[in-house]
Every structure is written in structure tokens, then in C-alpha cells.
């Protein structure tokens, strides 16, 4: 493939592109309305808003409607925020009434400004953004209802969230466990617990979770620049995530749970030891004795197959971990890298385990129809042939054209912009590679000529 004539320089937007040596000029005045292109042998490159619609409507595959899912994904509710204004008391009664009227009118105006949708006229479609519950004060069970209305969203929030929402959920989890009637867990006893201070910049992971036989366990505290440090205690494994959503669920006692687990472990160990003793006795009775030529007896010892015991800390998530992760899933299914690191250090898990748990939950919800992944330009059910044809004539889009393509493909503005950016990067790479090949060929030819002259 010959790339000699494909030398594109996309840093400068005034490119010369044509079919066979033609050129298309782009001026700043025609950037918003029309494009004018002139070429000796190239086709006409004038494209307006009407021509874009003709290109889109020309392809039958492009007009095919996207397949609707069985059940649409749940979206977050619109949380209305209201502002309150304080008024100062005056001596006369008339002035106080005026101040009250002014304050009420100001509060109405402020609330109307906050609640008015579509404030930004440039954005045509509103996206579901994961709202962090850091603004709420958790003081009673009624406040927990504000967290139960969160649904699953397919949008990755670009906003920088405060990691304090992780501690809010775990504190709510611990408080509900301490308020449950069937509970013998004392969250205030931290005598036998190790509380580790974790910074967001540290890479050390800890595993504070103890064995099931212990009555208490700890969850480490966070000291980050954006959140205040708070010591957190892990609840008992009898607590269920259903208590967070205010459903009555009967829970078992932690002491009974530990006693049952200890009895089961003791019974299993006794059976295992008895089986080993019986096997050893049988093997000793069935020892084979062989005699050598000298008359010496050689005892052939049997090989005893003993199961290897598990060593190290358990990598499986405990019941507390699953319940806390279930509460974190309700807030966001796309945690940032900083949030994933904090969660892994709090729960004593690795970074990859937390990341894979969120990925598996997204896959599970998508199979059940409760969650749908964000649409990509390549798999949105519409072909990209009109975009490719438009890219051959013009490598850059105006804001108006980008919005029209985004509305036609039902994708975001940034996806169309990134699509053209990626196409330009590919052409840049091909042109640079072609130039490098040409330089290598020229160097080889010069070397051959020099060798022939010397010969």
C-alpha cells in the first residue's frame, strides 16, 4: 500500500484534502453555516445542516431503531434542595411582618431557581448522575429512607465525589446493627481490636476482620484530606442488608452462630482424626517385609495421604463484606480508583477483588434487566457509514454539526467528538509510518549507490 501522498497534518485545521490532488479550504466565517471546498479532480465538499440529514437518511441500516430492553434501568430520583433564610427580629411589629414577607419571597425565588430543570440550554438531554449522600445528616431511622430510593445507573459520574459517603454507609450499617433487637454485639468495645489509620496516598492493605469465633471485629478508619477520620466497628454476620431498606427480617444470635460453628469444626476435626488413626493402624498391619540376600529385613513404609491444611488468610468475602458491598452497590456501580482503594483497605480485601465484585454485580444486574450499560457509538444499533463518509471530506466538526450527529445517533456530544478525534489519530499514525518507511527506503537506496561507487 502506497502512502506517499497521505501526508496529513491535523494540528492545523486548514488542511488541503481532495480526491486526486484537489483541495478544500475552510474559513472561519463559514465555520458555523456552510463549508466551501474547491478541487481540480476531487468531489464537492460543501456540507450544510440539510446535507447532513440527507447523508443520514440515505442509509437504511442507519434508520433502524434500537432494540428496546425488556425493562428500562432504574434512575435516580430528582432530589429537590430548598434554601432557608434567617430573619432578624426588630422592635416594631410592622417591620417584622415585612421581613417575614421578604424572607418567604426570597426562599420561593431561591427554591424556584434550584428546582427549575434544564438550566443549561446547550445540553439537550439530562443524564442520570450518581448523587453522593454526603449532604445528609444521619441522626434517626427516618433519615435512612433517603438512601433507599437510589437505583442503578449506567452513567459514570465524572464529578469528583467525596469519599465520605463510604463511611456514611458503614456508619449507618453499624448503627442499624446496634439498634436491632436480637443483638448481643457491643460496638463500643474496642479493647481487643486494632484500629488502623488509612491515608488515601498509602498503598498498605490491612485485614482487620477476625475469625468467626471472636465476638467483635473492627473496620479501619479513614483519614483523608476530604473526609474526617472516624473509627468504625464491623457488625455481626447475622445482620442482613434488608434491615437497611427498612424490612423486618429475623436475625440469629451471634453467640449461637459462633457456638454452632465451633461445634461443627470440632466434630469435623474429631472425625478427621479418627479416620487418620484407623488408616494408620491398617497401614501398619499391612506392612510388607522383604528380605535381601544377606538376610536383612527391609520394611517398606506405606505412603500416608494427608490433606494439606489451608494456610494464610481467607480470600473469600465474609458475610459482613457482602452486606456492606451490597449497600455500596446502591450508591454507585462505578467507583473511582480512589474509592476502590479506600473500600479495599476498609474491608481488608485487595484492589482487584473489590473491582471484580463491582464488575460482577453489573453483569448480574444486566442479565436480570435491572441495569443496562451505557451506549457506545459502535454498538448503538446504527452504522457509522455516514460519519465515515463525512470524515473523508472534512476532518473537523463544528459544534452545531456535532450536536446534530449526537441527536441522530442518540449518543452524547463527547462521544461524537472523541470518534472524530480517534479517526484523526489513526490517520496521523498511518502518515507518520508511511513517512518513516519512505525515509528508510531512501536511506537504503543511498547506501546501495555508495557501495556501487566504491566497488
From Swiss-Prot:
Protein name (database record): Homeobox protein 14
Skewed-composition ranges (Low complexity): 1-16, 24-39, 81-118, 179-239, 263-294, 435-445
Subcellular location: Nucleus
PROSITE patterns per UniProt: HOMEOBOX_2 (PS50071)
SUPFAM superfamilies: Homeodomain-like
DNA-binding region: 310-369, 372-431
Native source species: Dictyostelium discoideum
Region of interest called Disordered, as start-end residue ranges on this chain: 1-53, 67-121, 178-239, 258-296, 431-455
CDD domains in the record: homeodomain
Pfam families linked: Homeodomain (PF00046)
